[in-house]
């Protein structure tokens, strides 16, 4: 009876166990799809796809290498939520084949494994382009080719070119393009003279100057003839040094010419827009009235005529009036009527005086002067009348008044003393009855000179002796221009 009672309980437990096993079967959780392996620079990565689930699924990736003893599935990634796995750490020989399988787990349920196809890193993977450097040395172009960087067991390193392995770059194809034409060169990595663990080097002779060289390269693997990606072109232009130097000459000349023309144009433009203006001179207040009176005053144009005459020495009672000669003359001695024997008269006193006439008015002579004027008659009609346009009066005269005294001059004893004075004279100073008239002998008109109409500090002048007209009222001192100033008149 007890056995009959226990039998139904055992049957119920077995049925429940079978039902639980059916729930955990492969058909209960979807399997991953499109499991693929991609490798770039020997860095293999597994990718897969999975449908959207209410719960977030997790994945497990296993790798199996071909040719390994006791080859088994090795866990590469466990319980990851993303849809890729890097298996570079679990790859032995890059040239050998490998397989990958992936399963999903949702909650407590797992899916079946999804397997990939056979994959070899060296055969099916991609390798990036090598790096290039180009330079010119003397008459050659040096090309440096650096091995592409790869990942081996998770470490970045250059591609193995050891011939003992089956996955290495055996040769580099170098493409040189010059002036549109392309030439291909090959570099064997097994030659120690050309390559080392880091780079390979190629020397190309320069065939023509003033040309552009563009270089690109790609590597070829030893296994299955797989090629790397082709590098970008690196260009260099070769110039002839002599031609390059000569090209600077016209460039510099053109630049200098442009600068000069620019400066000239700028100066001309500034001068045209902003012409130079005379700066006004600010005078002090004390000079303003003087400048105004000088600019407003009008002066008539003067005319100057010079008359050259000669005369003989003369004497007065107890008084001798001497005139300053114009030209150098030797006066060894003079005597008066009182002392005729004291000094011997060795030479006749001679001088040349000039009559200077002008149209200006004659100023008055300061009264009170005791100087005796000297009068001369002139045969020229220019000096006959004071009111005519040919008459001139100067404001000063130069005379020497001599009186009897014991005085020696120029080495000769004489009883007369001379007083030299400069003063301004007027008509009222000399009464007509007190003036002594002195006649000149041998008056002769030599030349008539028209003096320049203007004098200034820039014109040379010479002081001349006194002149008197027929009336004997004026005693004048004048200036005449020298021979050099006549050229400017």
Curated annotation (Swiss-Prot):
Phylogenetic lineage: Eukaryota, Metazoa, Chordata, Craniata, Vertebrata
Gene Ontology molecular function: any one: cytokine binding
Compositional bias of kind Basic and acidic residues: 335-348, 401-412
Pathological association: Immunodeficiency 27A: A form of Mendelian susceptibility to mycobacterial disease, a rare condition caused by impairment of interferon-gamma mediated immunity. It is characterized by predisposition to illness caused by moderately virulent mycobacterial species, such as Bacillus Calmette-Guerin (BCG) vaccine, environmental non-tuberculous mycobacteria, and by the more virulent Mycobacterium tuberculosis. Immunodeficiency 27B: A form of Mendelian susceptibility to mycobacterial disease, a rare condition caused by impairment of interferon-gamma mediated immunity. It is characterized by predisposition to illness caused by moderately virulent mycobacterial species, such as Bacillus Calmette-Guerin (BCG) vaccine, environmental non-tuberculous mycobacteria, and by the more virulent Mycobacterium tuberculosis.
Family membership noted in the UniProt record: Belongs to the type II cytokine receptor family.
Protein name (record): Interferon gamma receptor 1
Highest taxon, organism lineage: Eukaryota
Reported impact of residue 61 to I: May influence susceptibility to atopic dermatitis complicated by eczema herpeticum; could be detected on the cell surface; no significant effect on interferon-gamma-mediated signaling pathway
